Each structure stands twice: as structure tokens, then as C-alpha cells.
């Protein structure tokens, strides 16, 4: 399939494997699109390499930086987003709140967006989480929050905040994105 680049670390590939196999649960027959830019190219490359181990229906797109979060990607990128079922966005600026992302989601794409992701945070930061454990923990917290009107968060280091939930919508964003139209950020 794909020959690995020498500068991609094992830690980056391990995290990419988690994104591809656990978070997105990519299947062999799926079309996968990885969108990156010059500032996040190392991360995009590692995601491409790992996805290429699962499917040969993969495309890596390097787009110019958008200069600010929420700015629409170039038209060719937006067009190709609508044609893929699995989209990984590893760019400096967020594409989460763009019409291109919304349209792709509406048409059934599942999308993982990682705005601002860099090599260090990809290798050693939150992306290295155990997503199966995280999914269970967040699901349990969602049940708790749905039943409470008042929430208090405190810690030994001095955190002490309380707020009313007011019947707000509970979003269980646990990093797992395995259904059409789903997005994880």
C-alpha cells in the first residue's frame, strides 16, 4: 500500500492509528479525505499514512492557510468534501463552522476536526487519550447532567464554580465519530 515517510515518529503514527481505527472506525471500502495545510502538514501526513493501511481510497489535500478560523476553504476543497464519507480536518484554523463542513455533514460525511493541532500535542497531548474509556466516562456524565439543574465543580487547587443547566442540550463529544453526519472537534 503506502511506504512510510522517515520523519513520521512512532508516537505520531500511534495517535493517527487511534484516530483512524478507534475514533473514526474507518472501513476498507470507505473514501477518506485528509485536509491539511503547511502548518499542520506533519499531522496530516501521519493521518494519511495510517488511513492508507486501512483503505486505498484515500486522498490527502494540502490547502493554503485560511488566515482565520471559520473562513471557507477554497472551492475545490469544499467540492471534494461533499464527495467523501470520512473527512479528517487537521488545519491551523478551524473549518468546523464553515458552510463547506456543514454541507458535507448534511450529505452524510462524518468529520473529525482538529484545528490548531501540532506535532507535540498530537504526539503527547489529549489526542493520545484512551477513547473507549473516555466514551464511557462522558456518557455517564451526560446522564448526570441531564438530571441536574444546578452543577458545582470544585477541586483542591481552588476551582469552585456553580451554574444552572437550564435544560440545555448536552453534547457528548467524546472523540468517537463513527456514524454518518457526525462531527467531533
List PLM regions with ranges.
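Active-site bordering "gate/hinge" segments
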Residues: 3-185
Amino acid at each position: 500500500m503506502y511506504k512510510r515517510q522517515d520523519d513520521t515518529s512512532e508516537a505520531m503514527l500511534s495517535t493517527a492509528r487511534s484516530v483512524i481505527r478507534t475514533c473514526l472506525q474507518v472501513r476498507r471500502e470507505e473514501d477518506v479525505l485528509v485536509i491539511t495545510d503547511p502548518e499542520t502538514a506533519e499531522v496530516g501526513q501521519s493521518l494519511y499514512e495510517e488511513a492508507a493501511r486501512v483503505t486505498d481510497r484515500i486522498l490527502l489535500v494540502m490547502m493554503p492557510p485560511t488566515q482565520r478560523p471559520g473562513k471557507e476553504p477554497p472551492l475545490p476543497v469544499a467540492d471534494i468534501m461533499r464527495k467523501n464519507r470520512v473527512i479528517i480536518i487537521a488545519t491551523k484554523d478551524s473549518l468546523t463552522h464553515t458552510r463547506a463542513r456543514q454541507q458535507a455533514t448534511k450529505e452524510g460525511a462524518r468529520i473529525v476536526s482538529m484545528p490548531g493541532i501540532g506535532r507535540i500535542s498530537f504526539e503527547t497531548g489529549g489526542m493520545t487519550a484512551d477513547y473507549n474509556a473516555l466514551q464511557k466516562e462522558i456518557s455517564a456524565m451526560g446522564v448526570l447532567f441531564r438530571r441536574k439543574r444546578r452543577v458545582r465543580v470544585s477541586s483542591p487547587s481552588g476551582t469552585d464554580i456553580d451554574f444552572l443547566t437550564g435544560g440545555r442540550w448536552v453534547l457528548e463529544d467524546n472523540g468517537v465519530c463513527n456514524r454518518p453526519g457526525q462531527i467531533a472537534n
